[in-house]
């Protein structure tokens, strides 16, 4: 018996993002072989998005770029960003998923950031570099991320992306409810 295949392109070569996409799709489609491939995709926004809207647009831009480059069943993009809300600074990620002619946008959980971290970001640094310096780690953005460090490993960047992907997949899982 030949197994059905779902091909997924992720707009990044970051293993955290690729693994999150693969894990989410395996949970959603357990009877399918999930083929996940990452590719470099420009976000068209600053390397460290500092607003909600730039972060969302970065994910959308990455998905659209991937759609123009290669054929797949699904296209995923995850863009991490930061903003200062009424309750203080926080980091979060937007998820953009394209399938056929439909685009779904989701967002991961908000992680409150220490003010000293936010101030370093305002000065032009990227979150991963700030966290590496603060916690004496190396390339944390391709591991547990700020989420893993600040929650003592109880949550990770990958777990946040995985959950956000599953939620953003709702329109594709229930197309009759999302005309």
Curated annotation (Swiss-Prot):
This is Inosine/xanthosine triphosphatase. Mg(2+) binds at residue 71. InterPro entries: ITPase-like_fam, Non_canon_purine_NTPase, NTPase/PRRC1, YjjX_NTPase. Gene3D superfamilies: 3.90.950.10. Pfam families: NTPase_I-T. Substrate binds at residues 71-72. It comes from Shewanella sp. (strain ANA-3). Homodimer. GO terms for molecular function: ITPase activity; metal ion binding; nucleotide binding; ribonucleoside triphosphate phosphatase activity. It catalyses: XTP + H2O = XDP + phosphate + H(+); ITP + H2O = IDP + phosphate + H(+). Belongs to the YjjX NTPase family. Its cofactor is Mg(2+); Mn(2+). Its EC number is 3.6.1.73. GO terms for biological process: nucleotide metabolic process; thiamine metabolic process. HAMAP family: Non_canon_purine_NTPase_YjjX. Phosphatase that hydrolyzes non-canonical purine nucleotides such as XTP and ITP to their respective diphosphate derivatives. Probably excludes non-canonical purines from DNA/RNA precursor pool, thus preventing their incorporation into DNA/RNA and avoiding chromosomal lesions. Binds 1 divalent metal cation per subunit; can use either Mg(2+) or Mn(2+). Keywords: Hydrolase, Magnesium, Manganese, Metal-binding, Nucleotide metabolism, Nucleotide-binding. Signal peptide: none annotated.
């Amino acid at each position: 018996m030949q197994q059905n295949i779902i091909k997924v392109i992720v707009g990044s070569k970051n293993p955290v993002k690729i693994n999150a996409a693969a894990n989410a799709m395996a949970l959603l489609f357990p009877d399918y072989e999930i083929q996940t491939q990452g590719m470099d995709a420009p976000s068209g926004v600053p390397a460290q998005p500092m607003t909600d809207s730039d972060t969302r647009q970065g994910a959308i831009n990455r998905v659209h770029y991937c759609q123009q480059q290669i054929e797949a069943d699904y296209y995923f993009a995850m863009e991490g960003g930061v903003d200062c809300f009424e309750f203080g600074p926080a980091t979060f990620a937007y998820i953009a998923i394209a399938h056929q002619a439909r685009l779904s946008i989701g967002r991961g959980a908000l992680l409150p950031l220490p003010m000293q971290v936010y101030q370093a970001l305002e000065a032009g640094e990227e979150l991963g570099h700030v966290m590496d310096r603060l916690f004496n780690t190396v390339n944390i953005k391709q591991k547990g991320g700020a989420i893993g460090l600040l929650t003592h490993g109880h949550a990770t960047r990958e777990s946040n992306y995985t959950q956000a992907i599953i939620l953003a997949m709702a329109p594709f899982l229930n197309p009759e409810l999302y005309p």
